[in-house]
Swiss-Prot record:
Membrane spanning residue stretches: 17-37, 50-70, 92-114, 132-152, 194-214, 239-259, 270-290
The protein's name in its UniProt record: Vomeronasal type-1 receptor 47
SUPFAM superfamilies with a match to the protein in the record: Family A G protein-coupled receptor-like
Subcellular localization(s) per the UniProt record: Cell membrane
UniProt-annotated glycosylation sites, renumbered to this chain: 159
Organism lineage: Eukaryota, Metazoa, Chordata, Craniata, Vertebrata
Length: 310
């Protein structure tokens, strides 16, 4: 068994990882609950509410599945069979793909919302929510089809008699694929990453250009260099811009660490960094979204004041 199988002996790594997962589950649960309450109370939904609520649900499920898999990495376990290994790993990878698809479509939707009426993208505003939902479903089904090879390559470690497998957890391992299969799968994944991250970069650049143009117009109208009070649309755009930048950086770092891990199968340090980095975006994003909600900010502020005055 390789060095990764001894990760359960590293208490600091285990505590750090479960702390990250716990914070992420709490944040996404609160954000999802907020959107559910907002919906049932009859508040007029914004176009971005559906994808943000969907993203929080995806991240919540992904972190829960990650927590289950982590128990088999960091805690001594009796062992899972092939069916459990295949189901958990496939579900986790599918949820990660859904996260990427939804984040990309959210950036495109915000670019459409921000577009002035005279721009061609403004024509899609009325049906943007429906179109984005269809795009998310299509991309998700496509990615789940790409990941179907996991039903063949994931197996229970107890069934293995060779040493060149890739460690997933104490019970589950990834069998090496043939050169042709590995090349096809890698090509499809690269195309998916380039397409979706390319959409994010394009929509983000477009929104930055619109915000800069709007600020210049506002300064000309005011006749002063002082900035105007930020509009709700601009606040939402700035939030999504920050998330998109963060997501792209995390995706690049994730790819670098993942490639390094493929080259150094027995490096437990590389694997520890890999499993930590994979969940940073899912952990941080709900708190960034909640920071733009005035009702939530005021609620937390009053709670802090109440605790301080106790």
């Amino acid at each position: 068994m390789n060095e990764n199988s001894r990760l359960h002996t590293h208490s600091n790594i285990r505590n750090t990882f479960f702390s990250e997962i716990g914070i992420g589950i709490s944040g996404n649960s609160f954000l999802l609950l907020f959107h559910i309450i907002k919906f049932f109370r009859g508040h007029r939904p914004r176009l971005t509410d559906l994808p943000i609520g969907l993203l929080s649900l995806i991240h919540l499920l992904m972190l829960l599945v990650a927590a289950v898999i982590a128990t088999d990495i960091f805690i001594s376990w009796r062992g899972w069979n092939d069916i459990i290994c295949k189901f958990l790993v496939y579900l986790y990878r599918s949820l990660r793909g859904l996260s990427l698809c939804t984040t990309s479509m959210l950036s495109v939707l915000q670019a459409i919302i921000l577009s002035p009426r005279s721009y061609c993208l403004a024509k899609f505003k009325r049906k943007s929510s429906h179109n984005i939902s269809c795009a998310i479903i299509f991309l998700s089904v496509l990615y789940m089809s790409i990941s179907s090879h996991l039903f063949i390559s994931i197996t229970a470690t107890l069934n293995l008699t060779m040493n060149n497998f890739l460690y997933v957890s104490q019970s589950c391992s990834l069998l090496p694929l043939s050169y042709l299969m590995q090349s096809m799968y890698s090509t499809l994944l690269v195309l998916r990453e380039v397409f979706l991250i390319g959409l994010m970069v394009l929509s983000t650049s477009y929104m930055v250009a619109l915000l800069c143009m709007h600020r210049k117009q506002a300064q000309n109208l005011q006749g002063t260099s002082l900035s105007l009070k930020t509009a709700p649309e601009q606040r939402a755009t700035q939030t999504i811009l920050m998330l998109m930048t963060f997501f792209v950086l995390m995706s690049i770092f994730d790819s670098i660490v993942s490639s390094s891990r493929a080259m150094f199968l027995d490096d437990s340090t590389c694997y520890s960094i890999y499993i930590f980095v994979m969940h940073i975006y899912a952990t941080v994003s709900p708190f960034v979204f909640m920071s733009t909600e005035k009702h939530l900010v005021n609620f937390f502020r009053s709670m802090c004041e109440w605790i301080i005055n106790m």
